[in-house]
Regions:
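Basic, amphipathic juxtamembrane/active-site segments
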Residues: 75, 88-131, 135
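Helix-coil boundary and interhelical linker segments in multi-pass alpha-helical membrane proteins
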Residues: 59-72, 119-144, 277-286
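Hydrophobic, membrane-inserted alpha-helices
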Residues: 31-33, 53-59, 115-119, 144, ...
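Select subsegments of transmembrane alpha-helices in polytopic membrane proteins
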Residues: 44-49, 105-113, 258-267
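Juxtamembrane membrane-interface segments at transmembrane alpha-helix termini
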Residues: 63-65, 83-90, 154-158, 299-309
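Membrane-embedded alpha-helical segments that form the functional core of polytopic membrane enzymes
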Residues: 44-100, 117, 141-150
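C-terminal membrane-associated helical module and adjoining short loops/tails
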Residues: 1-29, 151, 161-317
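Alpha-helical transmembrane segments
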Residues: 131-166
């Protein structure tokens, strides 16, 4: 029988892409929940749905300005995140993976933050802008739109894309969820019209993949050349020495960028949100999203594209 430590390690995607806080806090708690729910026969999708309601509940609490409502919001969002970790760990450990699960998993975090942004705007719109006698009013809604749609969403999607790229070169196709828009569009086109749910998913997922590809032209050029020499299904340990060297060099160059992908996902946002809500200055969170995380995003993107340009030259030579 596997020990808890062995099961925890098996539930990780890779040590390179797991954040310190997740490894030592979120994932162990998530695994305890996963084992508990699995023993009761609860499906991972139910846990994902629970996380959505917990995230919406957290948003409701963040609407209020008093300390205890905000403490409750912190606790609810932490439990939503534990559930989000739990469903993925359960799916990986038990093999209970479904299309509905993929939809819910991608949907849940978006629902949390959509609700949170609305709650923060409703909370602040009648408050005064610090140092002035002017209410935030529509200004806070404009900040939330910029933070959520133009910053948060593209940052998180590109960070996820870079993680999946890293996992592909580290563990091969089987250890990654690196998809491309053409394949997803082909799946959509192949589905009969009565399978409307699957068609809706693959149509939107193809668009999501396309948005990632448009922002990474140098990676697309490098990856196209890489697949010419490696083949679509090459796996680590079952490839030529030349391909193995390219794979190893890419992983070596990509590994330092994983800290940026981690900073652009949940934990850094959540910690900033917790602190600013508890201190009753959640507008700082929106500025953190727009200014600090955008700088990290631009830096990460620039370095990754430079890495891909270097790797492309290595392939050509």
């Amino acid at each position: 029988m596997s020990t808890f430590k062995e099961m925890l390690q098996a539930s990780f995607k890779s040590n390179d892409t797991e954040e310190w806080l997740d490894v030592h806090f979120t994932r162990p708690i998530g695994l305890v929940f996963a084992l508990f729910w699995n023993k009761l026969g609860v499906h991972p999708n139910v846990i994902t749905i629970l996380s959505i309601f917990l995230g919406i509940g957290a948003a409701y609490m963040f609407y209020y300005t008093d300390l205890w409502h905000n403490v409750a919001g912190v606790v609810l969002l932490m439990f939503a995140n534990f559930c989000d970790s739990t469903d993925g760990q359960m799916a990986r450990l038990t093999g209970k993976k479904t299309l509905v699960g993929r939809v819910l998993d991608g949907f849940s975090g978006d629902v949390w933050f959509f609700a949170i942004y609305i709650a923060l705007c409703l909370r602040m719109m009648y408050q005064y802008i610090p140092g002035t006698a002017v209410h935030w009013g529509l200004i806070i809604w404009a900040l939330a739109v910029v933070a959520g749609i133009f910053c948060h969403s593209p940052q998180a999607s590109l960070a996820d894309y870079y993680r999946q790229i890293h996992l592909f070169f580290l563990k091969g196709k089987a250890g990654s969820e690196l998809d491309n828009s053409d394949q997803q569009r082909a799946i959509y086109d192949s589905l009969p019209k009565h399978k409307w749910f699957a068609r809706l998913f693959y149509f939107n997922y193809a668009k999501y993949c396309k948005s990632q590809e448009k922002r990474t032209p140098r990676f697309q050029a490098f990856f196209k050349e890489y697949l010419k020499i490696s083949g679509e299904d090459a796996e680590p340990g079952n490839e030529s020495l030349a391909v193995s060297k390219v794979r190893a060099d890419f992983v070596e160059g990509s590994r330092p960028l994983m800290k940026y992908t981690n900073l652009l996902t949940f934990n850094s946002r959540a910690i900033c949100l917790y602190i600013t809500c508890l201190l009753n200055c959640p507008w700082v969170y929106l500025l953190f999203e727009i200014l600090v995380l955008t700088v990290l995003y631009v830096h990460m993107h620039s370095r990754h594209e430079h890495l891909c340009e270097t790797m492309l030259e290595e392939l050509k030579n």
